[in-house]
C-alpha cells in the first residue's frame, strides 16, 4: 500500500513537472535559400497549457505598430489573437474553430531538425502547397504559426518550395516575458471586426467627404464642414496633411452612387495650390472670369485653365466617370444582370506627394450634372508605409487643367483644340529639373456618333516647339463594367451604351494618367503645347477635350 502510494506520488510529481516545462523556440525565415536578416526572428513560448507566438522585436518592445501576438490555449486549441494597434490600444479576438478545420496528408518522410526526429505533413491553402515538419519528441504541441498545432511541435514550414521558416534553437526557460507585454484584461471583438481594425491601423486615413451630395440645386448650401459652389456641383473641404515620408504611398478613393441622376458624368477630385497670388479658389468665390484667360484665337475665352506667373490651376488628383444610374436605378431588371450597388474608384497619387506633405489644402470633388438628386460620394485619402519607391520626384508644378470644374458657374467647355494652336503654356524654371515628366490626363467628349467621345483622335505634346510624344487615348474595355450601369441604354445591335469604346474613359471607371518623359530641363523659360484634331460641331452638338498636365521632376 505504501509503495503504491509512493509510486502514484512520483508519477503525479513527474506529470506536474512536464506540465510546467516551458520551451523557448527561435525560428528564422528565408526565401529562395537566402535568410531574411531584416526580418525579426519568430519566437515561440510553449508549454502544456498554452503557446505564444511573437517575434524578438515584440519581446524587446521595439516593434513598430501595429503588431500581433498569437496565443493557443490547450487543450481546446482556441486561438486568441492580440493586436497592438498603437500605444495603449490593444484588442483581441478568440477563434475556437480554425485549428480543428485544418486537414493534412501525412507522409512517411522523416528527417532530423536540431536533433529531433520529425515527420512531414502536407496541406494546400489558397493554391499554396505547404509542407509541415513536426516532432512528437517534445511531448507538447506548438509551432511558429497556428498551422499544424494539432500534429505535434512544428519545427519547419515550407511554402511552394521557396519560402521557409525553420527552428534554429530550442531551450527550456523558467519564465517568459509575456505578462510584461500583455498586461491585464484586453477587450475582445469578433474576428471580422478584429481584422478590420487591425487592417485600418496599418495606414493613415484622411476622411474628406462622407456620403456627401453633389447635385444641381439652388438649395445646395455650404455648412461648417463642407463648402459648396456652382449650385452644389462642386464640394470643398480643407484638409491638413501630415508629413509624408520617402517610401510612403498615397491613394485617393471615391465611392459613388446615383441619387437621382441616371447619366454617365465627368467627375474629378482635385486640390487647389495656393503658392501664387491667385488661385482657383478665387474663381470659386468671385467668379470664373476673375481668373486668367486663355485665348487660342477662336473667339472664345477660357478662364483659369493655364498657369501664369501669378496663377496656378487646380491639380487633378483623379479623373473618374460615373456609371449610368448605379444604385438609384437598380430597379431596372435584365435577366442575368445583378447590378452592383457602389462604384469604387481608387488610384495611386504618390507622385503628387511633394505638393501635399505637411500642407493644409482645399480638397474638392466635382461631378457635372443638372439633377436635383445628383450623386452621393465618399472620399478618403490614405497614406501607406511601403518598401516600394516608384516616384522619386521632389517637385510638382501645375501647368494646365482644361476640365471645366465650374461648368455650372459659367466656365466654358474646353473646345480650344479646334485651332492648330490648341493649348499653349509658357512656364519658367528657377532651377534645373532632372528626369522631368508630364503627368497628363486626357479624355475626349462629344456624345454623338461623330463626336470625339467615339472617334479616336491623336494627342500630341510639344516641348519647346518639338513634338515629344503622340498617342491615341482610347478605352476598349468599357463592356467590362456593364454591371455598374443599370440605366445604360440598350441598342438594337445587342450592345448597351456603357459597352461602347470611348476616348480614354468608360462609364464607371478611373482614367489613368500618362507619364510622358521630357528628359532634363534647364532653368529658364519653356513651353508646353498640346494639339488634338478636334472634330467639327454639328448643329448644337460639339466636341471638347478635358486635359490636365502637371510637371514632375527633381531639383
Regions inferred by a protein language model and the residue ranges of each:
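Extracellular/secretory-pathway and virion-surface proteins
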Residues: 181-555
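Sterically constrained small-residue positions within well-ordered secondary structures
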Residues: 11, 16, 35, 112-114, ...
